[in-house]
Design a protein with these regions (language model features):
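Phosphate-group recognition and catalysis centered on beta-loop-alpha active-site segments
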Residues: 1-207
Length: 207
């Protein structure tokens, strides 16, 4: 519902967080578990999509106003979000709330993140590309290696179009990373309060 309202208000784009269910479906979910929003202390990766869609969102901004609206009280899928963005010509900004691992059974460095393999990321790209086509969209992540792997996915699919952008989100911009960003065609996404004029100049000078 939030994205329908954003689209109706004429927003340029809309950011969301994506996690993966037990049966490898992509849903919109920021938190590690559903406890805060739905009162259920379970992780997305421990539930199937069918089980998750039986949950009811009970907490959140203005939830009382939309408590009888299904699209506001049901956990949305990536398909729901992308379809809405496309309908309203909004740019989807998809934060991959996951961390790349080689085989899928490793522990992530950040305990707040799910483990994600390159195959999972290929599925994420394929679904997004299927719905959005040549329209602009973005993948972002705090984990740099996740963005590197998504670049490999794009390259494997011969995706040279400028409609797909990758951004590494960080609260600690590092000028030493400029060459890595440039080589892999990954942009910097940093909080304006965390980046200096020197950082901005260095990144601009390198294109």
């Amino acid at each position: 519902k939030a994205y329908e309202l954003a689209g109706g208000a004429g927003f340029w784009g809309a950011e969301t967080d994506v996690r993966m269910t037990k049966d490898k479906k992509f849903i919109l979910q920021h938190d590690l578990t559903f406890k805060r929003l739905c009162g259920v202390d379970k992780k997305p990766e421990d539930m199937t999509l069918s089980e998750i869609q039986k949950l009811t969102i009970k907490s959140g901004n203005n939830i009382s106003k939309y408590k009888n609206v299904k699209s506001a009280t049901t956990v949305a899928t990536l398909e729901d979000y992308l379809t809405t963005c496309k309908k309203y010509n909004m740019v989807p900004v998809i934060e991959i709330k996951m961390e790349f691992v080689e085989y899928g059974n490793e522990t992530t460095n950040d305990s707040r993140m799910q483990a994600v393999t390159k195959n999972n990321m290929e599925d994420l790209y394929a679904l997004t590309n299927h719905i959005m086509g040549n329209k602009e969209y973005m993948f972002i992540a705090y984990d740099f290696e996740t963005m590197v792997q998504m670049r490999k996915v794009l390259d494997d699919n011969a995706t040279t179009s400028t409609n797909v952008k990758l951004q590494h989100v960080t609260n600690n911009p590092d000028q030493g990373m400029i060459n890595y960003y440039k080589k892999r065609k990954i942009e910097l996404d940093a909080n304006c309060d965390k980046i200096s004029l020197s950082d901005i100049k260095a990144f601009n000078d390198r294109g």
